[in-house]
Structures are given as C-alpha cells and as structure tokens.
C-alpha cells in the first residue's frame, strides 16, 4: 500500500480504525466507524447531504465543469460496447475500461492528459437486486478524472487526487467533517492498485484508485510503466444524497418512474421505500439468503409480516427495475449491441426478457416498445446519439418482444418434456442447473417454468439472484489460450506494403522451419485478417519450390512448401507471386470494405463486421444485424457498392499513431477487428470507409471492377452473412446466371423476359394436375378398398384383410386405417417391399398387437418394422419375398384369439 497520509493530514484528516469492520480510514473528526454501510446507516434519506438538490444531469455537468476548470480536458463518453476497441470484455464497466489495454499498457497515448469523462457503465452482477435495495443499478454514470504518469511526464498523483476529491465534495456543499477516506485495494479490467473509498453518511460516493500493476492470469501482478490515477465518482449516488429521496431510482429516473406509476396504478409507499433502503444499506446483498434476511428485517421494523411486505413492495420494485432496465437497454442498443443468444447480445436479451417478465407481473397492457419510447424521450435530450437511434432502438425492441412471445409459447412443450424426464428419474424438484439451462439454451424465463411446473405438481425454486447467476456466466469472453510459438529469427521485412504492384523479388534465406523457408524479406502476403496468403514459387541455383502457403508467426513469415527443400540458409533466392490470385484477393478485400460501408448506409450504423473471409472466386462477410436482410435492401447494398466502384475513389493508405487515428476516425477503425500495436495501418476510402487493416488493396475503387452479391444467410442469431464476388469472378457468376436463364428459356421456348410468367403458369398447371392425380388416386383407393372388403377372410375369430397393392407407404397407411374400421386387422404390402398393418380398437383391446405381426413379416423381407399396437409399418430389401411375408403375417394372426 502506498502511503497517502501527507495530503490528508494537510487537509485536517486523521487516521482511525473502524471498530465494526476493522478497516483503516481517515476522518476530520474522531469517530468509531468508517462511514460506509453496514458500519454506518444511511444518514441522508429525508436529510440531503449537499447545499442544494441536483438531478443526475446537473451533477454530471457540475462534475465535468469542476475538473475542466482545473486543467482536465473533457472527452466524450465511449460506447458501452467495449468490444469496439478491446476483445476481452463485452461491456464497459467503468471509465478506466475506455483506456484498457492500449493506454494503460503504455503502448498508446491517452486522448488527453489529464482528462475527465462522464461514462455510462453497465454491470449486471447485481441485476436481481435492482429495484429491491434502492441503490443497485444495471446502468450508472461513472464520473472519472484520469491522469497518466510516465517517467518523463508526471501529471499528478495521490496528493492532488485526494485534494480534488475533497474540494469537489465541499464545492457541492458536503460538510467535510462527514467525509471519510477508507484505505482499500482495487482490481478490475486487468489492472490493480491501492485505493481510497470515499464515503458520506453511510454511502460510498467515489473510489480513488492509483493503478500501478497489471493483473496476471495466475492471479499475480506485475508493475506497469505508467502510474495511472483512476477515479470513479458514482454520479447517481451524488444526485441521490443531494435530494434525500428514498431510493436512487427516484432521484435519477423520476420522470420515467412517474409515467410508469401512472400507467400501472402502483401505490408508492414512501415509508416502506425509506425503511427498505435504510436496512439494505446496512447489508451486503449477495445471495438469495441475504435478500430473504433483508425482507425479514424490514418487515420486523415496520411491524408487518414478510408476506405483507412483499405484496406491498414487489410492484414498486418492478417499476424501479423497469425504469433502470430500459435505460440500460437504450445505451446498449444505441451503441450497437444486437440482441442474440451469444456474447453481449445475450446480455441485452437477458435484460429485455427480464423487463418483459416484470411488466407481465405488473399486468401492464402496454408493449415494451411503448415503455422504451418513454425512456428514450427522457434520455435523448441529454444524449444526441440516443436521439439519432430512436427508431432503431424501438425496431429492435418490437422484434425482440415478438420473439419472446414465440419463445414462451414454444417453451411449454420443452418444459413439460423436461419435467417428465425428471419425474421418471425420481426427482420432485427441478435442479438449478437445469433451470438455468432452460433459460440459457431455450430462452424460457424461470417464472414461466415455475407456472408450467405448478400445473403438474412439480416443484421449482427460483433463486432471488437467478438473473445475476446467468449474467455472470456470460459477461466476459472465454477463449482457449493460443499456443505461444516463437521463432528466433529477425522480423521479416514486408515488401508488399511499399511495393504493392511488384510480383517478383529477391531475398536471402535465413532459416528453415519445418516445411518452410524463412526469408529476410518477402512479397508473399501471409494469411491474416480473413485474407488467404499469396501462393507462387521460389527459385535458386536450379531449384524450384512451389509455395502453397505463407503464414506469420510473430513477426516472422514462413513460406510453406510440399516440395523437398533444396535451398540452404544463406542462399539468395528469387520469389514469384501468382498474379491472378493476388489481384482477385486484393479486389475482394477492398470490395469487402465497400460492402460494409454500403450496408451501414442502407441498414443503419449499428452494422458491424462480425467476421470475413476473402476468396478468389467468392468471399463472405458477416454483419451484426437484428433481422434478415430483405431482397430490396440487398439490391440497394449491391447498387451502392458498385456506385463506389464507379466513383473511382483513390485509396489513402498510411501508418498512424493509434491515438491520433482513433481521435480522427473513432472506433469505426476496428470494423475488421481490434488490431494490436501503438501504430496501425489505416486504409481510407475518402468519403466512403476507413479501417485499420493490414490487407492488400487496390489503388482506386475502380480497379475492383464489378461487385456481385450472390446470396445471404442467417448464420447465427444476430449475424447475417453476405456472400459476394468481385472483378472477373463476379463477371463469371453473372455469365453463369445468364446461361441458366437462357437454358431455362430454351426449355420453355420463350424469351428470358417471359420466363417468370411461364414458370408461374406451368407451376399453377402442375399444382392443378397434382391435385387431380391425388383425387384420382383417392378414387382408385376407394374402389380398391371396396374390392378388398369383399375378399375379407376369417382367421380363427378375426376378420382380416391381407393383400398386395400398388401404392406407396402413406397410401397404404390410409387404406389400412380405413379398412380397420370395418374388420379386425389389415395387412397390406407393395411390390417394393413395404408393409403396413392396422388393427381395430376392439381387436387391440382383445390383445392383438399389429406391430408384432408386422415386425415378424418384415423380417421375412430381410428388414424390420415397428409401430404401435393399432398401426405399424415395416420394409425390407427382399422384394421377391412379399408373398412369403404376407403368409408370415397370416400365420402370426392365426395365433391370436379374439
């Protein structure tokens, strides 16, 4: 722990030890406890701690202005979708996430130094507590002032940080004698360091972290070159203590809550709310047992039963949770999260479906789209980016609401089947793992599962922290660690960046690795970024090697060959690139950028590249999107991409410092994925697209030639795949399509323009003929049935029909079922070795099992059969033994007594 007592002492604070929790803390006045709950009760409810009341946005402005006046550059908030610039977490959980890992590792300069930001942040690790405790939120605004100190540039450290905090709190009218600084340790997002938790009247308002370490995978830590001031001021809590309302929701979401109360008719009991918040503040609410204990304590204080408390509090808690959740969704969806069954999309869908369930509990008739509209209208005055995505947000919510309704309807059958299996295994209660799996895999809410289970007398216990458990399983990316292969050779000089048109080069062999050559320089593009490697050949001293693949291991390019290597290290070689392949891959790569840009224009700026694979003949591009792309949209994307080609825009390709590139272009740079390094290669198509990209590209968009979109498919929930071709491959596809059109026209002896109408007419006529054939078959079958009825025979006490018919399996089943209404048993076979049996209800009650009869008969055909006692079928390859099979059936029936 670094020592930070000097500044605190100068400000008049003294060190104490909390008699309740044992933590070390600092205070201006002598006190026994540290000032944080549960050691101290909330002392601000009904008794505001500041000199005036602030709403959330007033305190946010006050915070930003305070630090701007003290030399901090205000920066715009980052998207809550952290995957825009990092690949280890899905959502922003604190303002420091904005600068991890690139700035905090020292690789990249910060956007300003020092800086201040009001960052919307999302944490779902307490989602079940939202609405219940008065203080828990899924989405909150973290005010952060940050300073990044290096060896040659010390901005400020602990003394200034502590004074800034003290001054800001007193600036808004908080009595300094009520402020405590608790010594602690912080860890998050891959970094850690000592910290102070700053509390007033029982609530933690800010955390002052002094980041000095990187957290290692094994739990250890190592020092980092930067020393970072990372502060987090909970701005919702500042608004809360300034207003003294019963809950933080009332202080920050008042207009939305008022509208929800009006719509639901829920009665707000401020006595219960205040008492609940007071008691919750004294508890660490982590588990189901904690929540039960909270309710018991509140009920005891109010002199009512737990059941009475739950009846009174549950509707209010639902209103608060809906207000919080819709705010969280507004930021998620505006910033590009697409609800799905995976990754950040799963978390968005979890919040959507939990909100829908809460609305159902309240008996709300309004749609979630209606409620989201209320929330968006409230937020858009403060966040222009939410205003610009208003329609997009509502479209997604509307679609998700309909999907949820279908899921619940479909879920009944799945739940009933699961309960049946559990009962068969002797279980009387659904295990938690299965409850979570039904939600995780099928989207069935636990409350719905409980309702269905209750109907069949099966027990389901839903933990109060169910959604928290589910969220925790899905909050971070889980990837298999890659094997770290290191080659002890100098970095390969990559010639294709400076000389993109060259196809021949000279280099020296500096090593051999497995079946590959390592050169000091190369024109071979190694596979990466979804672009396959170049191929070609290498020659030296009469030796010629075909290069099938080039790959980059670290900074070293290995040129793979299937030939026996006949070149020694130290040899000078000549390399030759397959020109047609390079040209097609280059065209397809630039075409990918154009299609992404066109898709964003047509579908919306939520579109984000989820993957890509370039090819010679065709390429594919995966895009995040909440619904299927329509034919009209696809045609417009194709038209726009080709318009970019015809504009013949010259590309600008250059290396830039990462921080400068991000400042100029934003995170749109990382459409193709997050790239490492302090310097990145920026490929800009002015007025069209810009991306950080290491692939090969044409000089001008006109060099691509034709772009042809071939097809689309939904490869997973929330991801659309576009398959396309460019250049000569696109022309080839067009010509093949034209050939198919001409051949089809020739078959019908019409012109291509007449083909759709002709096909429609032929299809209509074919359907009519099919219906006529079906009608005639039914008539023939009826005649055949009459004929067979006349040939019914008696076997012991049974009336049976055994015959061969020229009909398929379905037709034989229909015949057998119809005949079994007039006789005891029917066995029919066709010349293809198919056999069917049916038995009347009376015959089955008397003991006839037609499935056993058919099984014996099918065995004669060399096959097998089965079914139910009243209807069965079978088949076998021995078509010459159909008559024998029927005789076997006759023999089997002769053993049955009616």
Curated annotation (Swiss-Prot):
Q: What cofactor(s) does the depicted protein rely on?
A: Zn(2+)
Q: Detail which positions bind Zn(2+).
A: 589, 593, 693, 697
* Highest taxon above the source species: Archaea
Primary site of residence: cytoplasm
- Which residue spans traverse the membrane? none
Query: What GO biological process terms are annotated to this protein in UniProt?
Result: alanyl-tRNA aminoacylation
Keywords linked to the UniProt accession = Aminoacyl-tRNA synthetase, ATP-binding, Cytoplasm, Ligase, Metal-binding, Nucleotide-binding, Protein biosynthesis, RNA-binding, tRNA-binding, Zinc
* Record field: catalytic activity: tRNA(Ala) + L-alanine + ATP = L-alanyl-tRNA(Ala) + AMP + diphosphate
Q: What PROSITE patterns has UniProt attached to this entry? A: AA_TRNA_LIGASE_II_ALA
Carries keyword ATP-binding? yes
Co-factor: note: Binds 1 zinc ion per subunit.
- What's a Gene Ontology MF term here? aminoacyl-tRNA deacylase activity
User: Is Protein biosynthesis one of the keywords?
Assistant: yes
Pfam families named among the record's database cross-references: DHHA1 (PF02272), tRNA-synt_2c (PF01411), tRNA_SAD (PF07973)
According to its record, what are the GO cellular component terms? cytoplasm
Q: What is its EC number?
A: 6.1.1.7
Briefly, what is this protein's role? Catalyzes the attachment of alanine to tRNA(Ala) in a two-step reaction: alanine is first activated by ATP to form Ala-AMP and then transferred to the acceptor end of tRNA(Ala). Also edits incorrectly charged Ser-tRNA(Ala) and Gly-tRNA(Ala) via its editing domain.
Free-text comment about domains: Consists of three domains; the N-terminal catalytic domain, the editing domain and the C-terminal C-Ala domain. The editing domain removes incorrectly charged amino acids, while the C-Ala domain, along with tRNA(Ala), serves as a bridge to cooperatively bring together the editing and aminoacylation centers thus stimulating deacylation of misacylated tRNAs.
Q: What is this protein called?
A: Alanine--tRNA ligase
What organism does the record attribute this protein to?
Methanothermobacter thermautotrophicus (strain ATCC 29096 / DSM 1053 / JCM 10044 / NBRC 100330 / Delta H) (Methanobacterium thermoautotrophicum)
Taxonomy of origin reads: Archaea, Methanobacteriati, Methanobacteriota, Methanomada group, Methanobacteria
């Amino acid at each position: 722990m670094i020592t930070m007592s000097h500044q605190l002492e100068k400000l008049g604070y003294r060190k104490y030890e909390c008699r309740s929790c044992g933590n070390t803390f600092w205070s201006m006045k002598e006190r026994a406890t540290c000032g944080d709950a549960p050691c101290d009760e909330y002392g601000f409810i009904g008794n505001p701690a500041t000199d005036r009341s602030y709403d959330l946005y007033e305190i946010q402005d006050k915070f930003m202005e305070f630090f701007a006046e003290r030399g901090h550059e205000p920066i715009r908030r980052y998207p809550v979708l952290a995957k825009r610039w990092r690949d280890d977490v899905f959502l922003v959980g604190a303002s420091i996430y904005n600068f991890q890992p690139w700035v905090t590792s020292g690789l990249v300069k910060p956007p300003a130094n020092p800086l201040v930001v009001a960052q919307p942040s999302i944490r779902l690790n307490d989602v079940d507590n939202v609405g219940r405790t008065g203080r828990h939120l899924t989405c909150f605004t973290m005010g952060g002032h940050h300073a990044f100190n290096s060896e040659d540039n010390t901005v400020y450290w602990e003394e200034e940080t502590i004074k800034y905090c003290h001054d800001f709190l007193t600036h808004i009218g908080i009595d300094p004698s009520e402020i405590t600084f608790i010594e602690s340790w912080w860890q998050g997002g891959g970094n850690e360091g000592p910290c102070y938790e700053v509390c007033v009247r029982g609530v933690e308002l800010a955390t002052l972290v002094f980041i000095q370490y990187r957290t290692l995978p094994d739990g250890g830590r190592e020092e980092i070159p930067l020393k970072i001031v990372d502060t987090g001021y909970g701005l919702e809590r500042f608004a809360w203590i300034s207003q003294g309302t019963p809950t933080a929701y009332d202080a920050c979401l008042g207009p939305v809550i008022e509208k929800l109360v009006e719509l639901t008719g829920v009665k707000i009991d401020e006595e219960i709310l205040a008492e609940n918040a007071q008691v919750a503040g004294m508890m660490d609410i982590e588990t189901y047992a904690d929540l039960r204990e909270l309710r018991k304590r509140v009920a005891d204080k109010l002199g009512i039963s737990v059941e009475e408390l739950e009846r009174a509090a549950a509707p209010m808690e639902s209103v608060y949770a809906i207000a919080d959740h819709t705010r969280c969704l507004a930021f998620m969806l505006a910033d590009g999260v697409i609800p799905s069954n995976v990754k950040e999309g799963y978390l968005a869908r979890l919040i959507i479906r939990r909100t829908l369930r809460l609305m159902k509990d309240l008996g709300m008739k309004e749609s979630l789209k209606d409620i989201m509209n209320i929330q968006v209208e409230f937020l858009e005055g403060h966040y222009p980016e939410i205003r610009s995505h208003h329609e997009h947000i509502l479209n997604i919510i509307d679609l998700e609401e309909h999907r949820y309704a279908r899921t619940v309807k479909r879920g009944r059958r799945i739940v009933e089947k699961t309960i049946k299996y559990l009962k068969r295994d002797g279980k009387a209660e659904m295990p938690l793992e299965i409850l979570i799996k039904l939600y995780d895999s099928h989207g069935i809410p636990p409350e719905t599962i409980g309702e269905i289970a209750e109907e069949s007398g099966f027990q389901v216990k839903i933990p109060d922290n169910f959604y928290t458990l589910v969220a925790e399983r899905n909050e971070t990316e889980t990837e298999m660690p890659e094997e770290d292969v290191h080659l002890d050779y100098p970095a390969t000089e990559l010639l294709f960046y400076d000389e993109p048109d060259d196809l021949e080069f000279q280099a020296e062999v500096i090593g051999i690795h497995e079946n590959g050559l390592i050169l000091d320089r190369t024109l071979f593009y190694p596979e990466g970024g979804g672009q396959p490697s170049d191929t070609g050949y290498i020659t030296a001293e009469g030796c010629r090697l075909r290069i099938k693949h080039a790959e980059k291991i670290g900074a070293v390019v290995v040129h793979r060959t299937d030939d026996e290597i006949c070149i020694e290290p130290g040899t000078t070689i000549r390399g030759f690139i397959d020109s047609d392949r390079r040209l097609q891959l280059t065209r397809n790569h630039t075409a990918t950028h154009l299609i992404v840009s066109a898709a964003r224009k047509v579908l919306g700026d939520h579109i984000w590249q989820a993957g890509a694979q370039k090819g010679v003949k065709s390429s594919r591009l995966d895009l995040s999107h909440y619904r299927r792309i329509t034919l009209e949209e696809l045609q417009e994307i194709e038209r726009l991409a080709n318009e970019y080609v015809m504009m013949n825009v010259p590309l600008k390709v250059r290396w830039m410092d990462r921080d400068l590139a991000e400042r100029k272009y934003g995170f749109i740079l990382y459409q193709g994925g997050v790239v490492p390094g302090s310097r990145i290669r920026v490929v800009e198509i002015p007025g069209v697209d810009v991306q950080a990209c290491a692939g090969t590209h044409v000089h001008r968009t006109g060099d691509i030639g034709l772009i042809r979109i071939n097809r689309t498919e939904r490869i997973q929930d929330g991801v659309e795949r576009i398959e396309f071709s460019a250049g000569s491959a696109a022309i080839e596809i067009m010509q093949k399509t034209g050939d198919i059109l001409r051949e089809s026209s020739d078959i019908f002896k019409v012109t291509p323009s007449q083909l759709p109408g002709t096909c429609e007419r032929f299809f209509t006529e074919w359907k009519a003929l099919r219906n006529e054939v079906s009608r005639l078959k039914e008539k023939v079958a009826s005649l055949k049935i009459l004929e067979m009825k006349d040939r019914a025979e008696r076997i012991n006490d049974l009336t049976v029909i055994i015959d061969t018919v020229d009909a398929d399996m379905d037709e034989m089943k229909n015949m057998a079922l119809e005949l079994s209404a007039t006789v005891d048993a029917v066995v029919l076979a066709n010349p293809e070795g198919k056999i069917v049996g049916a038995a009347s209800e009376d015959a089955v009650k008397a003991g006839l099992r037609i499935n056993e009869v058919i099984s014996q008969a099918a065995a004669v055909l060399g096959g097998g059969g089965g079914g139910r006692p009243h209807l069965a079928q079978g088949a076998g390859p021995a078509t010459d033994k159909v008559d024998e099979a029927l005789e076997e059936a006759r023999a089997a029936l002769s053993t049955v007594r009616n």
